[in-house]
Amino acid sequence: MSILKIHAREIFDSRGNPTVEVDLYTNKGLFRAAVPSGASTGIYEALELRDNDKTRYMGKGVSKAVEHINKTIAPALISKNVNVVEQDKIDKLMLDMDGSENKSKFGANAILGVSLAVCKAGAAEKGVPLYRHIADLAGNPEVILPVPAFNVINGGSHAGNKLAMQEFMIPPCGADSFKEAMRIGAEVYHNLKNVIKEKYGKDATNVGDEGGFAPNILENKEALELLKTAIGKAGYSDKVVIGMDVAASEFYRDGKYDLDFKSPDDPSRYISPDQLADLYKGFVKNYPVVSIEDPFDQDDWGAWKKFTGSVGIQVVGDDLTVTNPKRIAKAVEEKACNCLLLKVNQIGSVTESLQACKLAQSNGWGVMVSHRSGETEDTFIADLVVGLCTGQIKTGAPCRSERLAKYNQLLRIEEELGSKARFAGRNFRNPRIN
C-alpha cells in the first residue's frame, strides 16, 4: 500500500528539547514515529540537523528538519507510489535525495523519522506485529526477548555529579523470562535507592537523564560497591551482573584520560590508556562486571585493540562504531571490540541499522540495542531488539515514563508470544545458540 500523506512536526524530548515527530498515513491508518537525541555523541555520527537559531530553543529547534520532510521528502515519496513494505527502497530514495555522506542535507533526524514511520506502516500493511516485520526485513525466522541492562547509576555527561563514567548497569541475565528480569531490576533499583539514601542522604537519590541515581561520588569503584550491596540486599547476587558505559571520549585529553573531568583542569592527574585499562581489569576482578562500553576514546584504536585482546568480557563499541557499517568494518579488522551498540539515530535509517546489526553479528560480535538520553514515548526499539534477536537492550532505569515505555512494550510482546517466547538470559552475547 502506498503512502497517502506524511506530516512532520516539532515535539519535545525527555530533556525538554525539540525533536522530530512524523505522522504517516496509508489506507490502514495513521503511523507515528518520534526521533531520539543523544547528549554524549560520537563525532562520526550522522548529522542531527538543528536550526542553530539562538533566539529559539537555544538554537536547538528542528524546524528545518521538519520542513525538509513536509516540503521535500513527503511529496517525493507520495509521487513515487512505493509500497510501505519496501523499507530498503524507500530508505534508499531518501538517502539518494539527501546525497551527502552523513545526511547533512536533510538531517538524520528527518530521514529517520520517516524511516521509522514507514516501518510501522509496513507491519500494519502485512498485518503482523512490528517485531515480526523487522525480523522479516532482517531475514530472522525466530524472535528473541532481550536481557534489559538497567542504567541505575548515572555519571558523565548525563549527571551533575563528579562521577566520570557515564552508566552503571544491572542486567539480570539469570532471570528465566523478560517479566522476571523486570521484577529483579525494579527490586534492585529500590534497594539501591535505600542504600544510597542511608549513605549519602535523601537528595542523593535524585535521578539523572535516564532515570538512574546520580549521587555525588567521585570514585567509580564506589558506584560498583553500591551496586554490589544493592544486588545482595535484594537477594539476587546469583542472577544479576554489572555492565558499564564509560563514554571515555568525554574525558580524553591529549592521548590521556581525566577521571575528574568535571573539576577545574589539571593535566598532572591525567592517566595513560594502560593505567585506565588496569583500572578496568581491577573492576572485572573484584566485581561481576561482564560488559564495558566505550572504555577508550573513539580514535584511540591501539588502546581498544590491546584491551579487547586481553580480557574475556564483552567490550562494546558506541562512539567507536556509531552504528556505521564503515566504522564497524574497521573495528572488525582491528579486533577493537566484540559488541556493537545499535542506535538508530546514529546512522539515521532502519535499513542501515539492520545492515549494521547483521554486519556485526556475521563477524561473531554481540549487539546491544540502545535508547538515547533524550528520549520520547516512542517504543520502536523494543520491537527492534526482539526482531533482530540481539539478546540485549539498554533503555535506562526502571524509572521515567520515556524509559518504561520501551520496557512495558517488551512485556506486552513477551505476553503476546506466549509459549513461543524465548528469553536470551545468560546467552545475551550470542542468543541464537541456545
UniProtKB/Swiss-Prot annotation:
Pathway in which this enzyme or protein is active: Carbohydrate degradation; glycolysis; pyruvate from D-glyceraldehyde 3-phosphate: step 4/5
Cofactor(s) named in the record: Mg(2+)
GO molecular function terms noted in the UniProt entry: magnesium ion binding; phosphopyruvate hydratase activity; structural constituent of eye lens
Gene: ENO1
Reactions that this protein is recorded to catalyse: (2R)-2-phosphoglycerate = phosphoenolpyruvate + H2O
Protein name: Alpha-enolase
GO biological process: glycolytic process
Residues at which Mg(2+) 1 binds: 40
Subunit comment: Homodimer.
Enzyme Commission number: 4.2.1.11
A GO CC term assigned to this protein in UniProt: phosphopyruvate hydratase complex
Matching SMART domains: Enolase_C, Enolase_N
Cofactor note: Binds two Mg(2+) per subunit. Required for catalysis and for stabilizing the dimer.
A Pfam family recorded for this sequence: Enolase_N
Function, as annotated: Both an enzyme and a lens structural protein.
